[in-house]
Swiss-Prot record:
Database matches in HAMAP family: Adenine_deamin (MF_01518)
InterPro entries named among the record's database cross-references: Adenine_deam, Adenine_deam_C, Amidohydro-rel, Metal-dep_hydrolase_composite, Metal_Hydrolase
Keywords, ordered alphabetically: Hydrolase, Manganese
Name of the protein this chain belongs to: Adenine deaminase
KW Hydrolase (keyword) present: yes
Length: 558
């Protein structure tokens, strides 16, 4: 006998011959297929949408009085660890902002704890109001230049595809490995048919070769011209708006009725305080609309476009057979989420989050000595330059004497990266753009190897900040004069198992401390990317300065 049709038990409710569990009456429903609005009712049974129209009756009925109903929002690419929250706390926080699905790459924790880290994140996803679907970390470590806590080759990953919660292969950051035909890199690309890319500034024949190898999405575009070229080549465009990476304003012009099916929103890296105070994908919608994008196109980017890109036909639209994931909002331009439903239930009805205790060590290092963080040299020096609103850096040169650092008048500070895995290696460099006046910050979040990174106006305050992070077993610290503010992160030195409200309060305290230090907003997020060797142009690792364009170590003083 043939298998029964999908949702055969729901056919009577869909036909209206049996009552639905819930019918939302008198709603304005967003049609993600045509990017338009339709007045009507929404009928739900067993967590599935069974129909729209005017003829449905329900065991429970609710009159929305013309309120707008939008499919549940989808984040196309995120690293949950960057929120500083474990998945349970993260899910409850973003669900309140209309998000019901996130496509997450757990490569932060995988770089520290390997397969054990991935298993931890998978175990955290059960029973949440947000469906967390994971992309397997493809680059652990990010490049051969990085020394982290784990190495995952294709054989290590082979047992994950097909498991519940695993959707595909995460961002392929090792662009030189792809273009060079590295067998180990190519072996990973055949593990899944859904393969995310990572191709900052890649263009022309190299972009063609990268696409030919399998990755077909990118969230690293920072200019409209770059985005247009990648769309023309068939890539999916993830328009990013994170804590530091703010690309919506530059990329809105490329989103049209003709390209919107290939465009989605993502947040990539967002601290919990930004999520709580400003929002998640709902914030992306508001930002895009304020930048001139039609609300209906923005809504399509947040719903159906990512669902189709990731081959998720059970969500992304208010249509029969799809999950009853949706949010009720005030108007499409201001997009204030009043209520979120996940699988037909208000997210407020989901059980309070219960964090799983981590089972792996965070730090295996000691505080470096003053001699280890000294920098020697005189003359032309390579300096890492921050770029406001981006994780890209500039490769700058200054005439200076290392013994005279810091040079507050020219905004030149010392930057230090300490190996967290017990190897004892320490890299020292110079950074421009923080604007600190007096103090230092340090953190055990340092993409992607997550060594301990610090920047400050003097050796004493830098060492104080490093000491605070290491004594906490991982976390973030700010030092101003003798005042030390610390946010411990007890899960791998990346996340906290404490409630979101406590983490947000800790972040608020750190923000107050950094305001006393002076300088840019959210310096911790900028700091966390200064060791990321897969993003141009200049980086610092625990081995020293790294040219991320030439892909080689370079001296501070040539």
């Amino acid at each position: 006998m043939d298998a029964p049709p999908l949702h055969a038990n729901l056919i009577p409710a869909a036909r209206g011959t049996e009552p639905a569990d819930l019918v939302l009456k008198n709603a304005m429903l967003f049609d993600a297929f045509s990017c338009s609005w339709e007045e009507g009712d929404l009928a739900i049974k067993d967590g599935i949408i069974v129909g729209t129209g005017r003829s449905y009756r329900g065991i429970r009925e609710r009159d929305l009085g013309g309120a707008l109903v939008v499919p549940g929002l989808i984040d196309a690419h995120v690293h949950i660890e960057s929120s500083l929250l474990v998945p349970q706390e993260y899910a409850h926080l973003v669900a309140a902002h209309g998000t019901t699905t996130v496509i997450a790459d757990p490569h932060e924790i995988a770089n520290i704890a390997g397969k054990e880290g991935i298993e931890y994140m998978l175990a955290c996803r059960a029973g949440l109001p947000v469906d967390i679907l994971y992309m397997l970390p493809s680059c652990v470590p990010a490049t051969p230049a990085d020394v982290g806590g784990a190495v995952l080759d294709a054989g290590d990953l082979a047992g994950f595809p097909g498991r519940d919660g695993i959707l595909g292969l995460g961002e392929m950051m090792n662009v030189p490995g792809v273009l060079g035909g590295d067998p180990g890199v190519l072996a990973k690309l055949v593990l899944s048919r859904i393969r995310d890319g990572h191709a900052p500034h890649l263009s022309g024949p190299d972009l063609n070769a990268y696409l030919l190898s399998g990755p077909d999405s990118d969230h690293e575009c920072t200019t409209a011209s770059e985005a247009k070229e990648k769309l023309r080549c068939g890539m999916y465009l993830f328009v990013r708006e994170g804590s530091t990476e703010k690309n919506i304003a530059a990329l809105v012009p490329v989103v049209t009725p003709y390209t919107v099916s290939r465009c989605s929103f993502c947040t990539d890296d967002c601290h919990a305080d930004l999520l709580a105070h400003s929002g998640h994908i709902d914030r992306c919608i508001r930002t895009a609309v304020a930048g001139g994008l039609e609300p209906e196109l923005a809504l399509r980017m947040a719903t159906l476009s990512p669902a189709e890109r990731f081959s998720l036909p059970d969500r992304g639209a208010l249509a029969p057979g799809r999950r009853a994931d949706f949010c009720i909002v005030d108007d499409p331009r201001h997009f204030a989420v009043k209520e979120t439903y996940s699988r037909g239930r208000p997210v407020a009805e989901y059980a309070a989050p219960q964090a799983r205790p981590p089972v792996f060590a965070a730090l295996r290092c000691t505080v470096p000595s003053r001699d280890q963080i000294r920098l020697f040299g005189t003359g032309r020096a390579r300096v890492i330059g921050l770029v406001p609103g981006q994780i890209l850096t500039e490769s700058l040169t200054f005439d200076l004497d290392a013994a005279a650092l810091p040079d507050i008048s020219r905004d030149l500070l010392k930057l230090v990266v300490c190996n967290r895995y017990g190897k004892g290696s320490v890299g020292t460099g110079i950074v421009h753009g923080f604007g600190f006046k007096d103090g230092a910050i340090a953190a055990s979040i340092s993409h992607d190897a997550h060594n301990i990174v610090a920047a400050g106006t003097g050796d004493e305050v830098i060492l104080s900040a490093l000491t605070a992070v290491i004594r906490a077993g991982g976390g973030m610290a700010a030092v101003h004069k003798k005042d030390v503010t610390v946010l411990p992160l007890d899960c791998a030195g990346l996340m906290s198992t404490h409630p979101a409200r406590e983490v947000i309060a800790g972040l608020d305290a750190l923000s107050a401390a950094t305001r006393r230090i002076g300088g840019i907003d959210d310096p911790f997020m900028y700091l966390s990317f200064l060791a990321l060797t897969v993003i141009p142009a200049l980086r610092l690792t625990d081995r020293g300065l790294f040219d991320a364009v030439a892909f080689r170590d370079v001296p501070v003083f040539p």
